[in-house]
Amino acid sequence: MMLSSTSLYAAIDLGSNSFHMLVVREVAGSIQTLARIKRKVRLAAGLDTQNHLSQEAMERGWQCLKLFSERLQDIPLDQIRVVATATLRLASNAEEFLQTATEILGCPIQVISGEEEARLIYHGVAHTTGGPEQRLVVDIGGGSTELVTGNGAQANILVSLPMGCVTWLERYFSDRNLAKDNFDRSESAAREMLKPVAQRFREHGWQICVGASGTVQALQEIMVAQGMDELITLAKLQQLKQRAIQCGKLEELEIPGLTLERALVFPSGLSILIAIFQELAIESMTLAGGALREGLVYGMLHLPVEQDIRSRTVRNIQRRYLLDTEQAKRVSKLADNFLLQVEKEWRLDSRCRELLQNACLIHEIGLSIDFKRAPQHAAYLIRNLDLPGFTPAQKLLLAALLQNQSDTLDLSLLNQQNALPVDMAQHLCRLLRLAIIFSSRRRDDTLPAVRLRANGETLYVLLPHGWLQQHPYRAEALEQESHWQSYVQWPLLLEEFN
């Protein structure tokens, strides 16, 4: 069956560092990514002191757009949005570039204001990023930095500042020297630019801070490569700065997890981010699921911003893989009941509760491939599917839980994830496995009144007197489960009460 072009949408962002194109297909009220194309054009590097854009920089941009234009030919014009940001807002000869660019693409290009850019970034984050409703969004681009606070779908404070990782690179690291002096000057200039707006942001407050740029993506990749958790903090940023200073020169910058492509603008982006953390008194930051391009696409689709993006993602997976939602709810409800019984002893919090519920709601996804090795298939799918609202670390945890939902346990998977402390992840795994065993008859009226009691790592499963004898299938499964858990030093004791 041919893919209907009417369901295709494209968003192009002519940024100061890179040009990006996102092509998506609308599927049942959400988007499926078909193509993401990114080319480092470094347009901002072509600006001289008079803000005149060099011929070479324009040529780099046009070459990239020729590549994009072929992909756009199958998409209806009213389903394409092309925007230009900081450098083309600033360039005195922007019109010359835009005229040729419009001819190449065959569709209009809109040079958007910094405030409109901030609004679109926030819109993209609101559609793709989970967590609390009240958020601060930070996007460090090539030529500008956007700061936005908002609640749910509504942006409140929108600020765009003329500092970016390309302009700061040319201004403070032009000698390609990673000396402390260069970092100090770069940070100091960024802090001066932030001072007029910082207090307003601090007074407004937020529950979660989200980063939506290549700099933040690079930091995330570095942290994952080094086995850290995914929360970005000022201490980690300072640590990375020291590491960069030790490297001495930009061409010698080597940090595990930092790609060659991102290395050039990494020190300048890092110094801007450090200044933002200091001036706005940010405690921690996570990576956004989307930003400007997603904001453009969702704007064309007119889809409402859901209160809980993770729930929407889980529902879409259940629909797409034809999961038995009744059974998923049954397992989820039982696992939740188990968690509430042991949460004090095991110090399980609301994060644990939500992640356990999500694991339960999609635990049978592996069956859509085959019953044999279903847990492994489930883990593979969860690791590789696009899951809006879930961070990379949360995806790894869900995959680890699903791979360990039955049979022998592989603790290395739970130890390698960093969404939760290892002991919490292990405790969730134990509860998930028990909920699946007790729900195996797939009927509500067969669930016993199970009581759980935890004492350190020992877990007591208390059942009504005679239940084990009357239910030999599940009794055997529980006996086997007790052995499997004991192999990894998780004592599981079955007892009956009158």
UniProtKB/Swiss-Prot annotation:
It comes from the Bacteria. Pathway: Purine metabolism; ppGpp biosynthesis; ppGpp from GTP: step 2/2. This is Guanosine-5'-triphosphate,3'-diphosphate pyrophosphatase. Its EC number is 3.6.1.40. InterPro entries: ATPase_NBD (IPR043129), Exopolyphosphatase (IPR022371), GppA/Ppx_hydrolase (IPR050273), Guo-5TP_3DP_PyrP (IPR023709), Ppx_GppA_C (IPR048950), Ppx_GppA_N (IPR003695), PyroPPase_GppA_Ppx (IPR030673). GO terms for biological process: guanosine pentaphosphate catabolic process; guanosine tetraphosphate biosynthetic process; nucleobase-containing small molecule interconversion. Belongs to the GppA/Ppx family. GppA subfamily. CDD domains: ASKHA_NBD_EcGppA-like. Catalyzes the conversion of pppGpp to ppGpp. Guanosine pentaphosphate (pppGpp) is a cytoplasmic signaling molecule which together with ppGpp controls the 'stringent response', an adaptive process that allows bacteria to respond to amino acid starvation, resulting in the coordinated regulation of numerous cellular activities. The keyword Hydrolase applies. It is an enzyme of class 3 (hydrolase). It catalyses: guanosine 3'-diphosphate 5'-triphosphate + H2O = guanosine 3',5'-bis(diphosphate) + phosphate + H(+). Keywords: Hydrolase. One of its GO terms (molecular function) is exopolyphosphatase activity.
